[in-house]
Amino acid sequence: MIYLDNAASTQIHEDVLTSMLPYLKEQYGNASSIHRYGRMSRKAIEKSRKQIASLINADPSEILITSGGTESNNTVLRGIPMVNASSNIITSSIEHDAILEPCKQLSQNGLEIKYLQVDKFGMIDTSELKNNISDNTCLVSIMFGNNEVGTVQKISKISQICHEKKIPFHTDAVQTIGKIPIDVKELGVDLLSISSHKLHGPKGVGALYIKNGIRIDPMILGGGQEHGLRSGTENVANIVGFGKACEIAKNNLTENMAYVTKLRDLLIKKVLDGIPEVTLNGDPKSRLPNNAHFTFLGVNGEDL
């Protein structure tokens, strides 16, 4: 079988699995405990935090470990402080449901949500973004790379616009992490969501980059783990696996990106040249290396 659904999930890397096993068998201490087993777990978590941070050029203190992209996105949308009673959030019409569904509920609770439309390639109009920002805007959230058509947004430009207006900018980079280089300092983003299982790590763990100085109110309260931003006993094995996956992704990013891009372009050429009435969806140039999305006229997608 040829697996072509890596946008949905990836196979766990053998080295990732190996790194996790000791924390499922022998090193089972609670990271909040002060005894030796607890200290070993804490040390493993902090090492992983550094590995995660290194992949996106963040400081380890800026990494909040979560259960995945969905929780990271919800944490931002529900945790960002409101400007006033008339606050609004700006996002796009083609976000993942992990953004759209919380926005829908927030809207039902009285918060104004502004949805930016996209062009035929799935790209937002940055001029429209500028025009929609007001004194009441408390957050802009635009997906980095689209999970369906693969379009990569102009993140640096969006960051610049938001910073000129002094608005925090969040991007959902779950589909982008490990596929193309991400440097949060260079991009200028304030908040960024990532997930382990999209880059050959385990499911059920992810992270939220929170730039130093950005305030987020906690969504999960309890024992005060993750500097009080996400309470709950840490899943040490999964966090260790996530860290290892980030390390592997960083070490192989340039080589893998070139190889996958070459395969993608070959697939696109073969399909467009060899099959009639086919349309390539998404931006033809600004797209994820691992994404090729087509419409075959008269053919149901599920049947295909």
Regions found by a protein language model. Name each.
Residues 1-304:
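Pyridoxal 5′-phosphate
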